[in-house]
Amino acid sequence: MNIRDMSINAVLAAIYVALTVINPIGTGAIQFRISEILCVIPFFNRKYIPGMVLGVGIANIFSSLGLIDVVVGVTISVIAYTLSYFIKNVWINALQYSVLAGLFVALALYLVLGLPYWFSAVTVGLSTLITTFIGAFIFKKIGHRILPE
């Protein structure tokens, strides 16, 4: 990875962290993380995986769940981006990312806060699906203009 790619990854991580931390409804059973729009970027270009994984890890430090949210978020990202090597369709990748987020985040919310598992799985999964589909649409339309190859 060259310095330019490292710099772009650092900027993506920083933007993800900023969008997550300033969002008052970015954590919990009912959440809407606008920053998840960015999580589809590695589905278009895998060289941005490190930046997104780093961004998720740093952003989740600020979660009320603390370290467990860091582990869960990074795990979701690593699994989803690994699966994306075998799944080439960006929409299916956005879907699998959202399902993983719903299932794993709900488990953390259940174990740490005692929140109902299936309610959390559905609400987190749906909100993530909405934002990742928005991201997929945006980056499919204009990604080539705003993301360097």
Q: Each PLM stretch: what is its role?
A:
Residues F43-N45, G57-S63:
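Interfacial segments of multi-pass membrane proteins
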Residues Y16-V21, M52-A59, V105-A108:
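Membrane-embedded alpha-helical segments in integral membrane proteins
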Residues M1-F43, K47-P50:
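Hydrophobic transmembrane alpha-helices
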